[in-house]
Amino acid sequence: MSAPVTTIAEIGKHEGQSVMLRGWLYNMRASGKLLFPQFRDGSGIIQGVVPKNAVTPEVFESVKTLTQESSVIVEGKVRADKRAPGGYELDVANVQVVQRVAESDPYPITPKEHGTEFLMEHRHLWVRSQRQASILRVRAEIIKAVRDFFDERGFTLTDPPILTPAACEGTSTLFPVDYFEEQAYLTQSGQLYIEATAMALGKVYSFGPTFRAEKSKTRRHLTEFWMVEPEVAYAELDDLMDLAEGLISFVVKRCRERRRADLQAIGRDISKLEKIEPPFPRISYDEAVKNLQEGHAKGALETKFEWGGDLGSPDETYLSAQFDKPVMVHRYPAKVKAFYMEPDPQRPELALCVDVLAPEGYGEIIGGSQRMASYELLVQRIREHGLPEEAFKWYLDLRKYGSVPHGGFGMGIERAVAWICGLEHVRETIPFPRMLNRLYP
């Protein structure tokens, strides 16, 4: 009877037993009559041990001549070893080669250092590296945690369209698509549509791709990214801030609990993630402006920030670096925000909105607001922004038939992954990043 098939992630359940692994050769070391092949299977990496005197000559030679990324089925006995990265090694008894990578055309990504451009050209192979695989597993955990958070709190998943007839916030950064004899656009946000489903279902969220034709080359920008967007009927700004605080805390805790090994493999300082617990600091836009102006006076910021402007990346980085938790900046000037945001009744020049800035200088990961409930005021804002009123007729209907205070926010998955994993650039947060200068592979 053949040994049971298992995964490297589950190998600890089989200590002292013979098992079968199906995967690829990740790396190889040799020391005299001992071979130390490293195998990966998508769930992790384990070191095998092959003493020449413990296996047949054919098996020893087969392992010795394995090339990097050759696909293999390995049989061996699981042995606990505290020195091993995962706490276990595999005493190899037999190896079946499924496909041997040809020596004449070797795997291009070797253990040596490679430039970013080379790695991006070979992204379809780069994702196999230990670091990239760990990042993608953390990404999957974040997405699962987000869904669990909303599902457990009575939210209904709803799916807004990818092809839209109009922009959520203007057309300057939209990707146009020919839609038969009409002009359509790839969605920038599902928000307007999930406002409609929130009026039907109460508490909803969407999760899907969004597209921004921004000609930005910063470490924070992708042209295609994934966003989760909750929307809640009968919600005001404080409710939304509480919800965002709960979501972030839940997601980070889940990653600490379930993806600690992957975070360690990436080199993340997990002690910084241990601090992500409610309550989060909340500061007004006015307080943020004062803070930024003091930073400029001290020489920490090149440009003096003036009241009325939107926060740029250097401003977000400066502010968020002062806190060891996400900081919530609320009530921005309405003129720098989207047309649909509810004005502050105390100061109508401000919008009831919030941006959540991740610590360690990572900047905005969530942006949200209370939505405008008044039909007349929304019509006025659409006109002020020079938007086509006819295109928003259906959206205005929501204010005619049982309008209520409501709101929501969007959280970019890639920026959340970058922060939680401690990454320099968002290009590593998604399997195949789309950027200003990157459409391949």
Q: Where are these predicted regions, by residue range?
A:
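Conserved NTP-handling cores and scaffolds of large molecular machines
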Residues: 99, 251-255, 424
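Extended, domain-scale alpha-helical bundle/helix-rich regions
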Residues: 235-245, 289
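Catalytic cores of large soluble enzymes that bind and process phosphate-bearing ligands
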Residues: 134-138, 185, 236-240, 280, ...
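Metal-assisted phosphate- and nucleotidyl-transfer catalytic regions
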Residues: 160, 167-173, 247-361, 384-404
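TRNA-recognition modules of translation machinery and tRNA-sensing kinases, especially anticodon-binding
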Residues: 199-209, 218, 222-236, 256, ...
